[in-house]
């Protein structure tokens, strides 16, 4: 059977049962639970340091009213980083390469920020649709443009995450296939291709973390507009 490069993005099944829910829940089993010991393990200490550092970075754009949403934003970021990193392992499925999964994350969070703004300060929330000092003839066009821009935000969040991870996985598979094919024909070129594959994998590790950070950073900026 001939396999396509895009087969890696198909949702895994077992006896016809989709396993995407299991893939989404797996990252949580990898995090050590807090213990009652006075001295934590190295893994738990590293996890605490990582979470504290990222919490400080994520709360910088938010005012005091938005700090109560910090744990939720941090939870989304850790969840995305875990899934993205696990997806780089061989023979694994990456749920965040599915637009449906990313939209399921982006739409409720975006809708939450809009509802918060409309409940707390509806005048300011609706005021974002019309910049101050707009000439009267341009008011209808600008309201339409800003409304479209508002509703495109969750789509941009989901598509950005999907496109970047999908492109990286395809490049890794293409270069790995080239190295495998070239190995018996041109070993020297195959070795150079393997080195390139290793460097690209390191780049993908950075992309996996950066895309998760960008997702929650944009989310925090949207939240800042409405709190």
UniProtKB/Swiss-Prot annotation:
Pfam assignment, any one: ATP-synt_A
Key words, A-Z: ATP synthesis, CF(0), Hydrogen ion transport, Ion transport, Membrane, Mitochondrion, Mitochondrion inner membrane, Transmembrane, Transmembrane helix, Transport
Catalysed reactions, semicolon-separated: H(+)(in) = H(+)(out)
Localization, UniProt: Mitochondrion inner membrane
CDD domains, per database record: ATP-synt_Fo_a_6 (cd00310)
Single Gene Ontology MF annotation: proton-transporting ATP synthase activity, rotational mechanism
GO biological-process terms attached to the record: proton motive force-driven ATP synthesis; proton transmembrane transport
PROSITE patterns, A to Z: ATPASE_A
A Gene Ontology cellular-component term: proton-transporting ATP synthase complex
Membrane topology: Multi-pass membrane protein
Residue intervals passing through the bilayer: 14-34, 69-89, 98-118, 132-152, 180-200, 202-222
PANTHER family the record matches: ATP SYNTHASE SUBUNIT A
Summary of the function given for this chain in its UniProt record: Subunit a, of the mitochondrial membrane ATP synthase complex (F(1)F(0) ATP synthase or Complex V) that produces ATP from ADP in the presence of a proton gradient across the membrane which is generated by electron transport complexes of the respiratory chain. ATP synthase complex consist of a soluble F(1) head domain - the catalytic core - and a membrane F(1) domain - the membrane proton channel. These two domains are linked by a central stalk rotating inside the F(1) region and a stationary peripheral stalk.
Family named by the database record: Belongs to the ATPase A chain family.
Known partners and oligomeric status: Component of the ATP synthase complex composed at least of ATP5F1A/subunit alpha, ATP5F1B/subunit beta, ATP5MC1/subunit c (homooctomer), MT-ATP6/subunit a, MT-ATP8/subunit 8, ATP5ME/subunit e, ATP5MF/subunit f, ATP5MG/subunit g, ATP5MK/subunit k, ATP5MJ/subunit j, ATP5F1C/subunit gamma, ATP5F1D/subunit delta, ATP5F1E/subunit epsilon, ATP5PF/subunit F6, ATP5PB/subunit b, ATP5PD/subunit d, ATP5PO/subunit OSCP.
Name listed for the protein in its UniProt record: ATP synthase F(0) complex subunit a
High-level lineage: Eukaryota, Metazoa, Chordata, Craniata, Vertebrata
């Amino acid at each position: 059977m001939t396999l396509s490069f895009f087969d890696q993005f198909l949702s895994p099944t077992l006896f016809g049962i989709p396993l995407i829910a299991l893939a989404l829940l797996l990252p949580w089993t990898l995090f050590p639970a807090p213990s009652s010991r006075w001295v934590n393990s190295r893994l738990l200490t590293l996890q605490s340091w990582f979470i504290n550092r990222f919490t400080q970075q994520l709360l910088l754009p938010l005012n005091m009213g938005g700090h109560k949403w910090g744990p939720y934003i941090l939870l989304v970021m850790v969840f995305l980083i875990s899934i993205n990193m696990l997806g780089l392992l061989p023979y694994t499925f990456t749920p965040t390469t599915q637009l449906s999964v990313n939209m399921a994350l982006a739409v409720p969070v975006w809708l939450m920020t809009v509802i918060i703004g409309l409940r707390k300060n509806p005048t300011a929330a609706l005021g974002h649709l019309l910049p101050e000092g707009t000439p009267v003839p341009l008011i209808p066009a600008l309201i339409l443009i800003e409304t479209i821009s508002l509703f495109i935000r969750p789509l941009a969040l989901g598509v950005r995450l999907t496109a970047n991870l999908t492109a990286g996985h395809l490049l890794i598979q293409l270069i790995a296939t080239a190295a495998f094919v070239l190995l018996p024909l041109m070993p020297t070129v195959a070795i150079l291709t393997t080195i390139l594959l290793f460097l690209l994998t390191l780049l993908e590790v950075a992309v996996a973390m950066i895309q998760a950070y960008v997702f929650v950073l944009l989310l925090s900026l949207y939240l800042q507009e409405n709190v």
